[in-house]
Amino acid sequence: MELMKEALDASQSEVITVAVRRERLFNEQGKSLLEYIDLKRYTILPNTAGCFTAEDAVRVSRLGRELLEQLENPGASWVKLEVLGDKKTLLPDPVGTLQAVETLVKDGFDVLCYTSDDPISAKRIKDAGAAAVMPAGSPIGSGQGVLNINNIVLCLELLKENDPDFPVIVDAGVGCASDVALAMELGADGVLLNTAIAHAADPIMMAHAMRKGCEAGRQSYLAGRIPKKLYATASSPMEGAISYIPGE
């Protein structure tokens, strides 16, 4: 728990997502997980990890809201929605996900929705009322980074069309700081992290690296990268060059 606390501090995160489980809230020393989290500093985001049906995801979301309402945490109406398709890939069930979004939005939730990198599915989730869409870079916990850059770019384009402030967060598959930087350079508003830090040889150092990758990627996006071209463009002027130029 202390390692988790130090890693969170190193990352400078503002939101912590927590899976809702039927487990004891206290560890063997009688301490609660929440004792290690500064509730005035962090917003707690309950998630429905492990749910394979829309019905289960809705029930878990409501349980999470009840818990956070007792803590007066601003994330009480938030839920990170996951409706998984199978245990092997942990890829989302698109039909169940959409059903759960519609139900939870009607129930007053601000839904931050995990989905695949399919731009059409992402757009339908937004149209159903999700507060944020979270396309996967690659399968959960795989560490493969952003496998399909084009699809993430299309998701960003569709979701932010006429709505540039709509939050798009790359969720799942991140393995290292360069993955975070790439996601932010593409224009994502944030990246969800867990395994890449928790399973790193030095989680605290990796959390530092992820923060720097996030900052660098965002600054690069805002600065505006040069366009990619097939041929070279000399960075120094050719006029006055003391050399023979082939073909001229």
Give, region by region, the residue ranges found by the protein language model.
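Alpha/beta enzyme core
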Residues: 1-15, 28-43, 52-171, 175-195, ...
